[in-house]
């Protein structure tokens, strides 16, 4: 029962995180760029990240903790290689998330508060690059999950 609960929490966290990044990158970003100028668009992103990132911080902790527990519950030597790939790549994704949440997002928020639109735009561009990286890494994690079955 514990394994199923951990697996459920892991999958909910992963699907929320990847789905949120996918929506932001492929849907919200182009729509906001099409209809909003930087003085409206950049505060929208700042407010969106202020809601999304704390939720994803919880998801990242749940994903890593549940994944690590499941990995150790079968033993590192007995775990399929896909599990090791998932945890390793997921750990890299967590570091990338940490850079966004703890370093780049505060710059975006501060630049928006100061109405420094070029600098806020540069911070948003960096976040976009890091989200793109995490989307690619997330696809690798999903492929590893499929191969581990």
Sequence positions of predicted segments:
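Polytopic transmembrane helical bundles with strong interfacial aromatic enrichment
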Residues: 1-149
